[in-house]
Amino acid sequence: MLVASYFSYAQIARDNLAKKTDPAAELAQLLDSLSGHSDVIGSQWLATKFGVEEWSLDFYQIIFSIIQRIEGIRGMLASLEGFEHLRSDIEGHLDALKLAFTTTGLQVAWVSYGANHVNRSNIQPLKMCSAFLRAHISYPDLSIEERDQVIYTVNDLLKWLLEHQLEENDFIRQAIIEGLEQFLFRIERLEWLGWGYSL
């Protein structure tokens, strides 16, 4: 079962050698979909955009995932050589983007706060650093069909792991289950494959 799942992903990776993405490109694409001017409060705007209930567990997980991705990109860029001269600029844009997902951003009209941070002037630098980042961290840019195939394979694997976990209660298996559940959440809700090395 595990071997079959791995080879299924390996086949997708081979088929997508020319089509790559990276953490910054995925985040920029998501933020592009959130940019816009709406008079509803930020929490309502985001809940509607993601198709979740406002202040639900899924809502909080989405906000956390976005902030985690912003901080992850900051950490990745800090660890790479040759980016020092641009680091302070991109960090300013990352800080501005993050403000949209703070308490203020969620509790006032999106148009008066969130939209002022999730905008072209902050997203464009993220797209530009994507090219630099992709040389170091990249993974397949999946089509909708390929994403569905990955989701199907991971669900299959989860089912198998959960059946065995009921009998054996192994803490390592539980950690794998929780990791796969988070992976599924991100790929289904945010359409993020994740970091290349996490696969």
What label would you give each PLM region?
Residues L2-T102:
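Leu/Val/Ala/Ile-rich N-terminal alpha-helices, chiefly Sec-type signal peptides and the beginnings
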Residues H37-A47, Q124-S130, V150-N155:
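Short, compositionally biased low-complexity segments
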Residues E84-E145:
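Internal, Lys/Arg-enriched amphipathic helical interaction segments that engage polyanionic partners
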Residues A131-L199:
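Membrane-active, amphipathic/fusogenic segments and juxtamembrane/transmembrane anchors
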Residues Y6-Y9, Y60, Y113, Y139, ...:
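Sequence-level detector for tyrosine residue identity
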Residues L77-R87, L106-A115, D141, L166-R173, ...:
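Charged, low-complexity interaction regions
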Residues R69-S79, A100-T103, Q107, W160-E163, ...:
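Amphipathic alpha-helical interaction surfaces
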Residues W45, W55, W110, W160, ...:
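A residue-identity detector for tryptophan
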